Amino acid sequence: MSEKIKRLNFKHLQQAAWKGTKKSIPATTLCLLLFFMNMALFGYKNAVIAVPLTIIFNRLKDFSPDRWHPYSVMLINLVLATTAHLADMNVWLCVTLDFAATYLMVFLLTDSDTSKAYYSYGFGLVLYQSFSTTVPELRLRLMAIVVSSAIATLGLVVMYFLKRRQTGFKLDPRIFNPFVHLGGKTREFLKGTARAFKNLAAMLRFHLFWDPSEPLESGTFDFRLTRFAIRISLLVTFSFFLEQVFNIPKGYWLPLNVFIMTLNFYEDSMVKIKQRVGGNIAGVFISAILLHYITGFTGHMIILSIGTFLGYAVDNYLFRATYMTCYAIALSTLFMKQSEVFELRLAYVLLAAVIAVIGSRFIFANKKTDFQT
């Protein structure tokens, strides 16, 4: 009986490993292609473009082609790169632009309590700002985004042809015509922006002057969304402010972790914080062991590639955070001392956890228990 159980468990592990491999190969291939291509053609600062575009690709590859919106994806990234360039000029622009960009991004790209369409673009904003650019470098970054977006879209087309019999989706060539979709998207953006700022003003009037506002009736989706968008914008902006004022090494790890840990509901944020902190601690420990035996540029790239593959292969966020920490450390230790990287990684994730806990608990908090009927 025990032998039969062992065979069943081994078969289950094989099936899970094969499922994870099939899931990870497309995203890993695109991520590494964009990473090394941008590093070679556009400089190491633009290698980070691979991260947000791969997350977007990984989300869209299972959607029907009419939901890809390739020009919108490219334009949003171009706007975020330009915003990040301007925000890096001084503290006042940092506070103003980072708050506005994060607020609009979260508000306009969230259509349900569990939606995380904004997630990949938040990565882009943080990474674009952290790897700052001069004006000539900005032009290079915009070119890199255009090229990378085209390659990511090509990847979606390849995935469509590989899976079309299984999904039954139809590919309408008109989705690649910018004049067909951008007009409607522009109108949606303007209406959404007006609604976003109207809700922001109403929420602030209510909390600052106790002026009840009709558009924000308590318990509605708009009410929860506006509170969440304000909260995450305040926390991310505060983190960017600390990074810019103190000019701390690897400072972008702070706003990035705060952004990841802050979710719509307090209960979900607490789960994500525990997983993120646990994954980072495990990732630092594993990286310390690996880097003791694996040295040199090639060795670091091997760890980076394996971390990327495993990160996209698993669904459990604790393991994903572990593997992606190995990815980040393998890259960072090429330019900094290992001990310093380990210390900074742990310090930032713990500080980010404190910020996210306080913010999720006390700043425009949304608790599931408050909205249960």
For the regions a language model picked out, list residue spans one by one.
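Alpha-helical transmembrane segments and their membrane-interface boundaries
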Residues: 1-323, 331-373
